[in-house]
């Protein structure tokens, strides 16, 4: 099976999955998109990418090895990503002589862990990818197994496809559609709910209210649109709306703010640098965000909350985020579109993490800015110079302190008042 879907030459040579391979097939009852994701730890980030849009997860376990750390990691991530339909496929049963005791022990071990992380139900199936046992047809070698085959289960399992349509209306604006002076519409993919002409809507975060004039698609105008459709909305009023804004019904708008707590899956070989600015992309919004040191890291095997100052590759932790301006968001449990985000390194433009918002954090209202009589201009006048801050940044050992010291010496020789703040001295 792996040789069928693994497309990269490196994957075929090593016998492992590195990238996410998408394959399509259909039976008489259903159409399927299979995302074959890597199981090796160093490619966990690829697994998160593939699982982020899945409705069902098939967790493969080698019958000879049982439940491993990576099995637990993937199961935790699957649950974290909101996938509630899980199949535990115990593979290579032919190599353990189709021993029921081996299968039962693996199911019991996995069930204990699944309960701890909140997985309420899963479907265990003994299979052999090489021999085809219990994949498309029942196997005589596992006559002790009374369940369905893998394909039969996939054909009949109930997938919640209507939940998005039943939630409050949300449409992140992707672009402003203005082909001529007589038309101005706002295009996007409806992430949840439904919308009709004449509905009262609010533009978030600005809070401007208006009504829907028309719903336009490539095939013509609609009177109603639902989650999953890409549409262009026109309004009866001239309101300020642009890419990154969210259109919602007036009676149920999403929250907006600049602080929240989120669970973070770190996907970069470079560790998290607390308080450094990262680009945060959520829906169609992109803002600058800083991250406080992790509240804790989650130990995959024990699920303990471990003390952590940073997050390394494949680590999972809980952090507090601050953005440079208010954004529109919801908890990941309520909206994958407005609750899931990625972090992008500002220097390399690499995606370094995926996050899921837990809840909003409110700033304390009893803390106010204290005005000072001696302001910046007064200090500058006293020193008879224009104040400036010079920040020297670079890799460790690159000579930042040496250059900063030389700059201060030259400024001092020019009669300028200076103060040198060195990071090593602060931490000493």
Segments from the language model and where they lie:
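Active-site phosphate-binding and catalytic loops of NTP-dependent enzymes
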Residues: 3-18, 113-122, 155-169, 221-223, ...
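Residue-level signature of catalytic and energy-coupling elements of molecular machines
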Residues: 15, 36, 47, 58, ...
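P-loop NTPase switch module centered on the Walker A-proximal segment
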Residues: 1-45, 54-57
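Conserved Switch II/interswitch segment of TRAFAC-class P-loop GTPases
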Residues: 30-32, 37-43, 52-75, 79-104
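Canonical P-loop GTPase G-domain recognition
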Residues: 84, 96-166
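C-terminal effector/interaction modules appended to NTPase cores
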Residues: 27-30, 180-386
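Glycine-rich phosphate-binding loop of ATP-dependent small-molecule kinases
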Residues: 350-351, 355-428
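Conserved nucleotide-binding/hydrolysis micro-motifs of P-loop NTPases
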Residues: 40-41, 64-67, 83, 92-97, ...
């Amino acid at each position: 099976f792996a040789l069928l879907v693994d497309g990269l030459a490196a994957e075929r040579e090593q016998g492992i999955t590195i990238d996410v391979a998408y394959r399509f097939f259909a039976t008489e009852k259903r159409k399927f998109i299979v995302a074959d994701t890597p199981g090796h730890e160093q490619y966990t980030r690829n697994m998160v990418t593939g699982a982020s849009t899945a409705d069902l997860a098939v967790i493969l376990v080698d019958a000879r090895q049982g439940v491993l750390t990576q099995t637990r990691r993937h199961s935790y991530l699957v649950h974290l990503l909101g996938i509630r339909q899980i199949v535990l496929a115990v593979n290579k049963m032919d190599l353990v002589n189709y021993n029921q005791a081996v299968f039962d022990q693996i199911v019991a071990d996995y069930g204990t862990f699944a309960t701890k992380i909140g997985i309420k139900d899963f479907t265990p199936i003994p299979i052999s990818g090489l021999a085809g046992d219990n994949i498309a047809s029942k196997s005589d070698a596992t006559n002790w197994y009374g369940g369905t085959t893998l394909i039969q289960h996939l054909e009949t399992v109930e997938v919640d496809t209507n939940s998005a349509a039943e939630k409050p209306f949300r449409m992140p604006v992707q672009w402003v559609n203005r082909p001529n002076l007589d038309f101005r519409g706002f295009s996007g993919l409806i992430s949840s709910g439904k919308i009709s002409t004449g509905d009262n809507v609010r533009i978030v975060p600005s809070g401007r209210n208006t009504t829907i004039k028309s719903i336009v698609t490539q095939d013509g105008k609609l009177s109603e649109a639902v989650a999953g459709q890409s549409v262009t909305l026109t309004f009866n009023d001239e309101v300020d709306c642009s890419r990154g804004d969210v259109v919602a019904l007036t009676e149920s708008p999403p929250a907006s703010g600049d602080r929240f707590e989120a669970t973070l899956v770190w996907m970069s070989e470079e560790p998290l640098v607390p308080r450094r600015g990262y680009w945060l992309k959520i829906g169609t919004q992109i803002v600058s965000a800083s991250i406080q040191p992790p509240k804790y890291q989650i130990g995959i095997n024990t699920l303990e909350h471990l003390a952590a100052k940073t997050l390394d590759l494949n680590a999972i932790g809980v952090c507090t985020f601050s953005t440079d301006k208010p954004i529109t968001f919801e908890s990941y449990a309520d909206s994958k579109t407005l609750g899931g985000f990625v972090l992008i390194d500002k220097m390399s433009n690499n995606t370094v993490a995926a996050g899921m918002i837990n809840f909003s954090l409110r700033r304390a209202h009893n803390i106010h800015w204290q005005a000072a009589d001696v302001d910046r201009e007064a200090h500058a006048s006293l020193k008879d110079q224009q104040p400036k801050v010079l920040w020297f940044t670079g890799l460790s050992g690159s000579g930042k302190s040496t250059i900063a010291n030389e700059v201060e010496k030259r400024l001092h020789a020019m009669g300028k008042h200076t103060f040198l703040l060195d990071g090593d001295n602060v931490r000493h």
